[in-house]
Each structure stands twice: as structure tokens, then as C-alpha cells.
Amino acid sequence: MPQPPKDEAPKRPRGRPRLAIDRNAVADAVAALFAEGGYEAVSVVDTADKLGVSRATLYRTVSTKEDLLGILFERSTNDLTQRATALIASIDDPAERLTAMIRLQAEAAVNMRSYLGVFFGGVGVPADVYARWHSWSRQYEKLWVGVVSDNMETGYLDNGNPVVTARLILGMMIWVSRWYRPREKISIEEIAETATHLVRMGHPAPPTRSTSTRKRARGQR
């Protein structure tokens, strides 16, 4: 059987095969770019290079820098909200709950330090992304106000305005993202313990119940 001319042989499709884009991977790449060069270092082109995909592939999922910031925002806020909500639900003792929340916030400030200030400051951030961050921060603040109120009621914190107190604690913990330097070798645990000591102004925490006691208490509700 005669062979078809070479110029009639099946041709390989042009371009790379379409790849599914993992939004978590995109968020990781954007966070890495922030850490390397700040807000100006973030772009669709550089994110594609970080992910090892073609620009055309990434453009099908995210076409603008604003989209990239939105993905990082959603991942960061959802993770923080889920972890805070889980802590509040799993710890009955108010003192332990506040201590755990402060530790969580210290960890977030350290891990998100390259871009946390960008969202809170709003400088250079697209209006829609900043508006979503502002809306989320109000809801997140309510979680903190509830924890602070419980601690005031039980005497772990001095009585006062729980909203102002919650904002002051959050402000203190967010500021960690501005001054933290890995080379100083200050651990998250040290930051959390020092912050907790400051919040309670040196007063010892009230006796805490054991985990088994907390579980029994839940069963009696």
C-alpha cells in the first residue's frame, strides 16, 4: 500500500494540553511572589512561571492581577475563619480559648507577613478586593469580641469595652507581621505567650478545667 506523502502525515496539535489550575497552588504562588518582591512582584506572567504552566493556560482561570489577589484573599480569610471557628467550638474554657486565639493570630501574622499589611492598609489593592477584606474583617472581629466578652464575664480580663479590647488585641497581633524577622529567631510560641501575658496584665489565669471535664460538661447540656 502506498504511503501518504510526508506533508500529509498527521500533524501534532499545537500548544500545550490544557491543564486544570489548582486555586490553592495559585494562592501559594502569589504568596511566594509577595514574599520575594512585594505587591509589585505579583503578575499573571510571573504566577504562571511559578506554577510551571503556560500563560495562556493560567489566563483561562485568572486573567488579571486583581483575580490573583482575590484568590489569595479568599484562601487566607477562609482558612483563618475556619480555624478560629473550630477553636472556639472545641474549647469551652474562656481563658484557654483566648490563649488559643492569640496563638492562632500570632501564627497567621508570621505566615502572612508578606501581604497582611497590604490587605489591611489597602494601598494599591483593587477596590473590590479591599471591600471584601473589610467586610470579612468585621465578621472576624465579631468572633474576637465574643471571646473577649466571655473572658470579661469570667474575670480573666478586666471589665471594659469588649469591642475596643478586641480591636486592641487584634491590632497588636497584626502588627507582628510588620516587625517579625526570621533571623531574630523569635518563635511563634514566644510571641503568643508574651502577648497573652500583656493582655492579662500579669494576673494569673483562673483555674482551667481538664479536657475530660469539658467533655462531660458538654454531655450534660
Question: Which ranges hold each PLM region?
Answer:
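C-terminal peripheral helix-coil segments that are non-catalytic and often amphipathic
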Residues: 1-14, 141-153, 172, 178, ...
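Amphipathic alpha-helical segments used for helix-helix packing
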Residues: 97, 108-128, 145, 178, ...
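An amphipathic alpha-helix adjacent to DNA-recognition modules
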Residues: 20-28, 40-41, 49-52, 60-85, ...
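Basic, helix-initiating cap at the start of DNA-binding domains
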Residues: 1-37, 41-50, 67-70, 217
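Short, well-structured alpha-helical segments
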Residues: 99, 103, 145, 162-170, ...
